[in-house]
Amino acid sequence: MYAVFQSGGKQHRVAEGHTVRLEKLEVATGETIEFDQVLLIADGETVHVGAPLVAGGKVVAEVVSHGRGDKVTIVKFRRRKHHDKKMGHRQWFTEVKITAINA
């Protein structure tokens, strides 16, 4: 059984027991969180596709940790002008473990 849900403007395909990194959520470590924006639920035999959301669909997850991703380096450069600018960015994330998928 798997589901596709939306969080942080992105869609994630998950199954029970999977660990997923999401955009930072203001939830304490160890707490459970419910995602009700479920777009699709498949249980092996049938596929329930929402229009746009599955009615009564819910994905339950437990917050494992918070952290920051790998550094992304941004370089801006102007040719022949002795001008360059180097910046870096590390995105915050929340890691969750999927505990249940309810149709």
Swiss-Prot record:
One of its GO terms (biological process) is translation. It comes from the Bacteria. One of its GO terms (molecular function) is structural constituent of ribosome. One of its GO terms (cellular component) is cytoplasm. PROSITE patterns: RIBOSOMAL_L21. Keywords: Ribonucleoprotein, Ribosomal protein, RNA-binding, rRNA-binding. Part of the 50S ribosomal subunit. Contacts protein L20. NCBIfam families: L21 (TIGR00061). This protein binds to 23S rRNA in the presence of protein L20. This is Large ribosomal subunit protein bL21. It comes from Shewanella baltica (strain OS155 / ATCC BAA-1091). The gene is rplU.
